[in-house]
């Protein structure tokens, strides 16, 4: 069961960030706090309590009102004390189960989906995006926190800064308030309470304490924003390696819609170039295919995904592919029989995408997730575009005819297999 409330600790003075609230630092086009709240909302958390200091309270209040979040500010008048004290200040605002996280931690969507359904301290045994030397280590015994701290020489996992607790934790903070005069860390609370540990390994999360770490967080968000399920061989091994690096440079400057337009125009230019230079047209076509993944990467990294955006992008891709093959046929083919072959190639190219998109429309599910066999079939758009470029690099009539014949057979064979696998899947009453 997902907790309905979350406490976000944001009382630190952020001295290493130029005295700017770390929760309001923008990473990949969005404030860190916006990311945390938005992703928690998507997973069922409804109410948020932000514990901050007097200086930053007006800034956080304006942020909350601007975005319409159901959140409440609690002021910590003594932010120089440990963050355990900040947690204690929220005790009157939560009851039962609640999530706890830090305002300077950046999490990916898949991390939040797993973590919010965990229990106790969420730990990572395979951290990919943090500096191990600076991270808080955890020793685990009997599935509970045994020891915790940055200087542990022997440890089992890294503290991710995300917790799923209940109000029993405030009995421990009350004891530490009296023992430590309010100056104690969250780590002390977890070690004293011996909270449970849930492992969420190898997913995207990191903390942002310095300007340099913003770059690491940005890279993490872009790299974990790759869709993956519908990618073909060329995308996995070539296109994404390039597009993610470009996305890292653009994610703070360009919107997904702007990138969609740029990619579409480049695709149309590549089609027109078939009338001038086939090798150049092929190269531009492949370049447009590489860049075609950027709008989706930006949308997911910036939390700007929309059904409309995906719909428009899919339509424009069909126009690019249709224009390219039609103009290529016009520029290179003279015999009627090869016009027919080119027509089959064009129809097959359109139907490859239509067959999977129509599945989504009919069953409201991703065809590649529901029918995993489709992932292994050759003929996805990235593979067809790359193949087209290779054929066009050799300017002889036979290579163009071979291209159209290959595309005609490959695409229509793939559509036939897609139809077969879908019918087989749907015919089983428990599959859809």
UniProtKB/Swiss-Prot annotation:
Instruction: Tell me which SUPFAM superfamilies the record gives.
Output: Nucleotide-diphospho-sugar transferases (SSF53448)
Reaction catalysed by this chain? 1D-myo-inositol 3-phosphate + CTP + H(+) = CDP-1L-myo-inositol + diphosphate; CDP-1L-myo-inositol + 1D-myo-inositol 3-phosphate = bis(1L-myo-inositol) 3,1'-phosphate 1-phosphate + CMP + H(+)
Keyword set, alphabetical order: Magnesium, Membrane, Metal-binding, Multifunctional enzyme, Transferase, Transmembrane, Transmembrane helix
Please tell me where CTP binds in this chain: 9-11, 22, 113
Q: Top enzyme class of this protein?
A: transferase
Its Enzyme Commission number(s) read: 2.7.7.74, 2.7.8.34
**Molecular-function annotations in GO:** metal ion binding; nucleotidyltransferase activity; phosphotransferase activity, for other substituted phosphate groups
Which GO cellular component does the record give, naming just one? membrane
- Membrane topology type, per the record? Multi-pass membrane protein
> Where Mg(2+) is bound, by residue?
113
Instruction: Enumerate the subcellular locations listed in this protein's record, separating them with semicolons.
Output: Membrane
Region span, MobA-like NTP transferase: 3-225
Q: What does this protein do?
A: Involved in biosynthesis of di-myo-inositol phosphate (DIP), a widespread organic solute in microorganisms adapted to hot environments. Catalyzes the condensation of CTP and L-myo-inositol-1-phosphate into CDP-L-myo-inositol, as well as the biosynthesis of di-myo-inositol-1,3'-phosphate-1'-phosphate (DIPP) from CDP-L-myo-inositol and L-myo-inositol-1-phosphate.
Q: Which family does it belong to?
A: In the N-terminal section; belongs to the MobA family. In the C-terminal section; belongs to the CDP-alcohol phosphatidyltransferase class-I family.
Q: What is this protein called?
A: Bifunctional IPC transferase and DIPP synthase
Question: Organism, per UniProt?
Answer: Thermococcus kodakarensis (strain ATCC BAA-918 / JCM 12380 / KOD1)
Highest classification ranks of the organism: Archaea, Methanobacteriati, Methanobacteriota, Thermococci, Thermococcales
């Amino acid at each position: 069961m997902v907790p309905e409330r979350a406490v976000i600790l944001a009382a630190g003075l952020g001295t290493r960030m130029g005295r700017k609230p770390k929760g309001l630092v923008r990473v990949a086009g969005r404030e860190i706090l916006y990311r945390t709240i938005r992703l928690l909302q998507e997973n069922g958390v409804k109410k948020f309590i932000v514990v901050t200091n007097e200086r930053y309270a007006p800034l956080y209040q304006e942020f909350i009102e601007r975005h319409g979040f159901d959140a409440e500010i609690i002021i910590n008048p003594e932010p120089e004390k440990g963050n355990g004290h900040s947690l204690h200040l929220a005790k009157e605002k939560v009851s039962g189960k609640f999530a706890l996280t830090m305002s300077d931690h950046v999490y990916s969507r898949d991390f939040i989906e797993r973590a919010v359904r965990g229990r106790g301290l969420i730990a990572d045994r395979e951290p990919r995006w943090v500096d191990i030397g600076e991270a808080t280590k955890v020793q685990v015994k009997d599935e509970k926190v045994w020891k915790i701290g940055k200087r542990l020489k022997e440890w089992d996992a890294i503290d991710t800064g995300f917790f799923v607790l209940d109000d029993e934790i405030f009995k421990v903070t009350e004891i530490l308030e009296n023992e430590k005069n309010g100056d104690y860390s969250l780590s002390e609370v977890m070690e004293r309470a011996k909270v449970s540990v849930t492992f969420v390994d190898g997913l995207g999360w990191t903390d942002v304490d310095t300007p340099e770490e913003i770059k690491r967080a940005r890279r993490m968000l872009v790299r974990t924003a790759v869709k993956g399920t519908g990618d073909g061989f060329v995308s996995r091994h070539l296109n994404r390696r390039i597009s993610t690096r470009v996305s890292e440079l653009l994610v703070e400057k360009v919107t997904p819609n702007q990138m969609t337009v740029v990619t579409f125009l480049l695709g149309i230019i590549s089609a027109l170039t078939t009338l001038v230079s086939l090798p150049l047209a092929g190269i531009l076509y492949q370049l447009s295919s590489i860049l075609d993944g950027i709008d989706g990467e930006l949308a997911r990294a910036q939390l700007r995904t929309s059904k409309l955006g995906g719909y428009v992008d899919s339509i424009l891709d069909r126009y690019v592919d249709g224009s390219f093959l039609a103009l290529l046929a016009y520029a290179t083919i003279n015999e009627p029989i090869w016009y027919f072959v080119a027509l089959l190639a064009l129809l097959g190219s359109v139907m490859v995408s239509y067959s999977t998109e129509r599945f989504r429309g009919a069953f409201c599910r991703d065809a590649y997730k529901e029918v995993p066999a489709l992932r292994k079939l050759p003929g996805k758009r990235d593979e067809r575009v790359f193949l087209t470029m290779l054929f066009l690099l050799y300017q002889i009539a036979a290579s163009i005819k071979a291209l159209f014949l290959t595309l005609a057979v490959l695409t229509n064979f793939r559509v036939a297999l897609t139809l077969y696998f879908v019918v087989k899947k749907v015919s089983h009453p428990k599959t859809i």
